[in-house]
Amino acid sequence: MLDTSIQALINKWQKYLALQRNYSNHTVISYNNDLKHFLEFMNYYNSELVTINHIKTADIRLIRSWLAKRNCDNFTASSISRGLSAVKNFYRFLEKTTQLNSHIIFSIKSPKKTKLLPKALSEDDVVISLEHIEEYGNVKWVELRNKALLVLIYASGLRISEALSITKLHLQNLEFIRIIGKGSKERIIPWLPIAKNLITQYLEILPYKLGDNEPIFRGKQGKKLQPPVFNRELIKLKHFYGLPQHLTAHSFRHSFASHLLEHGADLRSLQELLGHKSLSTTQNYTKTSIKHLEAVYTTAYPIKK
């Protein structure tokens, strides 16, 4: 249970994240869920209605108990780390907007996350996917939407959230797409004709009228297409054609990066295309490419021990 004044603060915090920090809707929802989990634990821990004073005076024992509870509930290290980041973010917001001074929560370090290498698809699996994605949709414009979106992600390396934010304004430039990605970082990506042509064909038969600033990829009811809806289309494709279990919309972004590396792209250029803040993040793709080369060597090299 929360004091009504706290809910008002949470609402202001969410607006701050979305409008001033330019966080994606997905991140705002995730952060809100993490904060809700923390405050519910605080309510249980104190056995009384949570007030702003409870939040300000939360000690290190309470915070560590909450993190331990998440660990016992089988949250991954990544989820625990994100949850702590969300709560810290809320406390920073309180520092800006209330009389809260530096809080003990900022002394707590996030658990180390296990680094998972990005999983790419083989070029053959990508070709199969692009050739057959149109079979799932039941309506012509939906079928064309699915193909246009999948080709766009693989041809440009966009995150699914970025691809679903493309508007008609993005189509006005014939040579490149200007994308605002994570952390409001801007990057420029060349248009591939096949992607732009498919999008143009899709828009010609889309049964909904859109303004220039509205996202072009729509669901069957005319609302903005959401990532889980598109991934459900990919699940059908994956099951029918026996494609890898890790096939998702995001795996086509990984495939874009890995295949470019395998064909000679340099890391700095790839970093710019992917919108990575750190080169070390991009370097993870070299590890997957090396694994690919090792597999090719093992199966195809004529001289074996």
Swiss-Prot record:
Q: Which PROSITE patterns match?
A: CB (PS51900), TYR_RECOMBINASE (PS51898)
Q: Could you tell me which residue ranges the Tyr recombinase domain spans? A: 116-298
Q: Which domain of life is it from?
A: Bacteria
One GO term describing the cellular component: cytoplasm
- In which broad location class does this protein mainly occur, judging by the first location in its UniProt entry? cytoplasm
Q: Which GO terms describe its biological process?
A: cell division; chromosome segregation; DNA transposition
MF terms in GO: DNA binding; tyrosine-based site-specific recombinase activity
Stretches assigned to the Core-binding (CB) domain: 4-95
User: Which positions are catalytic residues?
Assistant: R159, K182, H250, R253, H276, Y285 (o-(3'-phospho-dna)-tyrosine intermediate)
Entry's SUPFAM superfamilies?
DNA breaking-rejoining enzymes (SSF56349)
Q: Where in the cell is it found?
A: Cytoplasm
Q: Which UniProt keywords apply?
A: Cell cycle, Cell division, Chromosome partition, Cytoplasm, DNA integration, DNA recombination, DNA-binding
Q: How does it assemble?
A: Forms a cyclic heterotetrameric complex composed of two molecules of XerC and two molecules of XerD.
Q: Matching PANTHER family, A to Z?
A: PHAGE INTEGRASE-RELATED, TYROSINE RECOMBINASE XERD
What is stated as this protein's family in its record? Belongs to the 'phage' integrase family. XerC subfamily.
Q: Describe its function.
A: Site-specific tyrosine recombinase, which acts by catalyzing the cutting and rejoining of the recombining DNA molecules. The XerC-XerD complex is essential to convert dimers of the bacterial chromosome into monomers to permit their segregation at cell division. It also contributes to the segregational stability of plasmids.
Q: What is this protein called?
A: Tyrosine recombinase XerC
Specify the species: Rickettsia conorii (strain ATCC VR-613 / Malish 7)
Give the encoding gene's name.
Answer: xerC
